[in-house]
């Protein structure tokens, strides 16, 4: 069964207080929240919600494509695997980091080597490390894992059932489009999804170009049984946006 969640940072603190956001998400029907900061893990639990994903390490600009960061990142990721196992968090989000002149082939090789160091630990804990694909055109200039084929090659080199992609529909629409065909082709390597409207990273409404009913149906047809996390910034009433997104997507999942 596919579940829905919603990203913390899109609503807190600019739109809602932490408590109001968590209560609104629960009231709207969401079983989980994405990217919850550590200081609010207990708040989410108190409202009966799960955490669908957290960052495996920080920052996203200095990531796994740097050999000189691997010792630090291994420790951070191992620590967060322990937290994830304890709290029942299924996914830890990993980042390539920025290119800074590094060519793609070398970046892929180094990123894969970094993930190999923690893959077995993730397997033993039952936690999936998902490498996030982000656009380098609009939101994250110079980010290296900015195309599906880049992330896919990393996952192939690591060759672990617990190392997959976080396929961000908004980001990949900006970089390459062809969303449904890509999902159908590489779905076995996708461990988590993010949504948002494009352009603007706002609601999944008719003011943006992505037709989410067809995209969600395509995801369902692959047999995916994980979480789809909404990562849009609401333009209007945040609570109404939470409710509308859940209700719009539910019939297709």
Predicted features along the sequence, with ranges:
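Histidine-acidic metal/acid-base catalytic patches
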Residues: 1-27, 34, 88-90, 145-167, ...
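N-terminal small/glycine-rich loop or linker at the start of catalytic domains
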Residues: 1-10, 51-65, 97-99
């Amino acid at each position: 069964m596919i579940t829905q969640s919603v990203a913390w940072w899109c609503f807190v603190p600019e739109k809602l207080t932490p408590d109001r956001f968590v209560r609104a998400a629960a009231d709207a029907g969401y079983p989980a929240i994405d990217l919850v900061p550590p200081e609010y893990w207990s708040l989410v639990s108190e409202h009966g919600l799960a955490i669908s994903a957290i960052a495996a390490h920080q920052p996203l600009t200095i990531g796994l494509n740097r050999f000189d960061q691997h010792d630090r990142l291994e420790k951070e990721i191992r620590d967060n695997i322990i937290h994830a196992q304890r709290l029942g968090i299924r996914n830890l989000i990993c980042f390539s980091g920025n290119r800074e002149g590094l060519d793609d082939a070398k970046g892929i090789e180094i990123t894969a080597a970094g993930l190999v160091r923690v893959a077995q630990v993730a397997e033993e804990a039952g936690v999936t490390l998902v490498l996030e694909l982000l656009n380098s055109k609009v939101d994250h200039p110079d980010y290296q894992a900015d195309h599906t084929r880049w992330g896919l090659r990393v996952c192939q080199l690591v060759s672990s059932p617990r190392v997959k992609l976080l396929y961000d529909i908004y980001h990949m629409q900006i970089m390459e489009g062809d969303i449904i065909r890509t999902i159908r082709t590489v779905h076995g390597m996708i461990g988590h999804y993010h949504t948002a409207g494009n352009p603007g990273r706002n609601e999944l409404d008719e003011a943006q170009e992505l037709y989410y009913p067809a995209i969600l149906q395509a995801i369902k047809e692959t047999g995916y049984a994980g979480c789809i996390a909404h990562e849009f910034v609401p333009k209007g009433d945040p609570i109404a946006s939470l409710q509308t997104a859940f209700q719009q997507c539910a019939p297709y999942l």
